[in-house]
A protein has these predicted regions:
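Basic nucleic-acid-binding interfaces
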Residues: 1-150
Length: 150
């Protein structure tokens, strides 16, 4: 082929350090817009971001020039610095060290967007840890509980 053409979608999830409930609703929209800006600066897009006070879900459309570990590291580093500027308890903010990322096919986009949009309602009934265990089982990803949670 004369050129490289890709369409790469990822559902990325990461939690706050020790899953502390620290992300305030009053900064969420601005946080996800900020993360969208980080992605735009790297030739990528945030299709939707949402979560709860202790974790966030993102549906990303990534540039063919990016590797998931490097862009997730950039998102976490830069957004953490931004959140700390909000003052108060947020000056102690941090994301967990790890993350989970799942590929998403075009036919799954609408369902994943809906799932992410409904996070607050979903977590009225389901714990974050149970949610992640469900993903790992659904996608047949081996995991060891000792190393999943920090």
């Amino acid at each position: 082929m004369a050129q490289t053409i890709t369409q790469l979608y990822y559902h990325v999830v990461f939690a706050t350090k020790n899953r502390i409930e620290i992300i305030r609703e009053d900064i969420e929209d601005e946080l996800y817009a900020y993360i969208g800006g980080i992605l735009n600066n790297h030739g990528s897009k945030l299709l939707i971001g949402n979560g709860t006070s202790n974790h966030s879900h993102f549906l990303l459309s990534l540039s063919k020039n990016l590797l998931i570990p490097s862009i997730v590291g950039t998102i976490k580093r830069d957004s953490s610095k931004w959140i700390k500027t909000k003052g108060g308890i947020l000056t102690k903010f941090g994301w967990q060290d790890g993350y989970s990322a799942f590929t998403v096919g075009n036919s799954q986009l609408a369902a994943v967007k809906k799932y992410i949009a409904n996070q607050k309602e979903h977590h009225k009934k389901h714990l974050f840890e149970d949610e992640m265990r469900g993903f790992y089982r659904k996608y047949d990803i081996p995991f060891d509980e000792k190393y999943v949670w920090d």
